[in-house]
């Protein structure tokens, strides 16, 4: 009897540890469903139907592997990726890495902040500038949760992730994509035009986010007081699998909904979020348009919080400089207000920011692969040969795609 109680207590204790250790991947996963994803996925689905769904599938598989490597670097070493680069790279390289990582973080935050402002505009009928002000206030309130520790923030952001996923289950119900065509688009690679390659790079840049590669390792580096190293890694694998599967589903649903609703109804020119919202109303009804607006708002608010956190990790990790998180939020809001006041087309800014992000992926991945493939550093948590080779393949694909983009832009294709 006492033995069975002991076993039961042990099982409950393990469950508590597993639950306590889950959450960091949900924060990272928010970076994979930000407003930049909305913009690129809607444009890709409206323009090419289901033909680019395979890009989302493979980008999500890549993202899952990358985030697992980032998370286990923090668990195995107690340091994040930026700190390892600072400790092991020459000083000029460290400064270069810091500058490009800050630029990437700013481009990310610009897209996320403007996306949330558009969400407020669509749902509540305010101006874009008023939406930006509301976004600033809302993100301040969410960031203040950090004063209560990491877990409350994980729960709020995880809840917003699940809300966006639920919203897209509803959108799929409204749009009713053709399952056979959808599955074919997921399985058969196709890049029909040069513009499709540009959009594929945007989808890749929107799906694999450099700033959350840095962030995830910092979220797991201080979990040493919660369970053994093997327990932490086991929980992290489950955490990453669940969170990234949800993010992958949302991205697929975004593109499939755009394909079913816009591409096959003669609205393949839908290229911005306002237009998507206004076009959804007559095609699928007010409820579908409202759900779209709310999901954009939830994704924008949560992802801009994550972007602010990532920017702080990058600055502290690379140059040991710390500024209060709320002050950083004020500073990083400025480019968004400049874009809005200048009257630039916000969705175009979103899509171009995602292309810019794709150039930062390889720069984050190369040192991540080097560190997680080092047995002296990682011990028994070193990458397997399969994971290391898959990581190298991701780097090659990203560099090749970026090279094509540079040539295409230079030739104005």
Curated annotation (Swiss-Prot):
Top-level taxon of origin: Bacteria
Homology family: Belongs to the NRAMP family.
UniProt key word Ion transport: yes
CC per GO annotation: plasma membrane
Database matches in InterPro entries: NRAMP_fam
Residue intervals passing through the bilayer: 19-39, 49-69, 94-114, 122-142, 155-175, 196-216, 240-260, 287-307, 323-343, 349-369, 393-413
Pfam families reported for this sequence: Nramp
Topology within the bilayer: Multi-pass membrane protein
Organism annotation: Erwinia tasmaniensis (strain DSM 17950 / CFBP 7177 / CIP 109463 / NCPPB 4357 / Et1/99)
GO biological process, one term: iron ion transmembrane transport
Principal localisation: membrane
Keywords: Cell inner membrane, Cell membrane, Ion transport, Membrane, Symport, Transmembrane, Transmembrane helix, Transport
Subcellular location: Cell inner membrane
One GO MF term attached to the UniProt entry: metal ion binding
Name of this protein: Divalent metal cation transporter MntH
Its job: H(+)-stimulated, divalent metal cation uptake system.
